[in-house]
């Protein structure tokens, strides 16, 4: 994982530390208050945890751009997804067998992140026709649907990667897909937690004021 210090704001490692800290707090609260607890302390911690996903999306895009070996990078992400599956499911009492306990949140977000990288590679392929790329995108959406953040994480990575070089457009796509996930939560799972998901947009504020300039990342 390679990073250079930036002229202003946070460097890559500092942003990653924020993401890891927020994720740890979020997951710890899920274990202390299982289910969709409306305890104010739990809600506050879950709001803090919303910082994690968009930072992950951003660094998947940056990692893809700067990696020296995209095949090894892809392999590392899928290994992470495999390890995270057992850790995530053990922590939350979910069956290790996919889809046995339902279709929502059946594995960690790492599964969707890894497939998001695959979509970036597919999108940049010069050999694949557009219709086949579209078919693959829909197939990846189906494959990643049961994971934490569902297929939204993979598709958000694709759109943010397509807008690389235009930070404002990247943040717009981030907010659009975050709002989509929030709407699903609001309609099908829990209204309060649907609103909580909207706090993902806090990451936009963080990036606007603290984002790293001229930072290289090889995740």
Predicted regions, residues:
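Short alpha-helical packing/oligomerization segments
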Residues: 192-198
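Short intrinsically disordered, low-complexity segments
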Residues: 11, 216-219
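Compositionally biased, low-hydrophobicity segments enriched in charged and small polar residues
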Residues: 1-2, 50, 200-207
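Conserved small/polar residues in nucleotide/adenosyl-binding loops
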Residues: 208-217
């Amino acid at each position: 994982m390679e990073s250079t210090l930036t002229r202003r704001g946070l460097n890559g490692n500092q942003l990653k530390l924020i993401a890891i800290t927020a994720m740890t707090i979020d997951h710890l609260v899920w274990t202390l208050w299982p289910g969709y607890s409306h305890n104010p302390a739990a809600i506050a911690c879950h709001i803090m945890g919303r910082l994690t996903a968009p930072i992950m999306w951003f660094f998947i895009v940056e990692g893809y751009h700067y990696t020296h070996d995209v095949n090894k990078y892809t392999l590392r992400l899928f290994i992470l997804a495999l390890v995270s599956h057992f850790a995530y499911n053990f922590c939350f009492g979910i069956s290790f067998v996919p889809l046995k306990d339902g279709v929502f949140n059946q594995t960690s977000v790492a599964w969707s992140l890894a497939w998001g990288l695959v979509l970036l590679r597919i999108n940049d392929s010069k050999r694949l026709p557009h219709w086949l790329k579209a078919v693959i995108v829909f197939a990846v959406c189906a494959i990643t649907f049961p994971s934490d953040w569902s297929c939204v994480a993979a598709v958000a990575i694709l759109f943010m990667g397509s807008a690389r070089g235009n930070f404002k457009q990247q943040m717009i796509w981030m907010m659009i897909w975050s709002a989509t996930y929030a709407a699903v939560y609001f309609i099908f799972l829990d209204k309060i937690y649907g609103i909580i998901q909207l706090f993902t947009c806090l990451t936009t504020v963080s990036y606007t004021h603290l984002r790293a300039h001229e930072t290289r990342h090889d995740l």
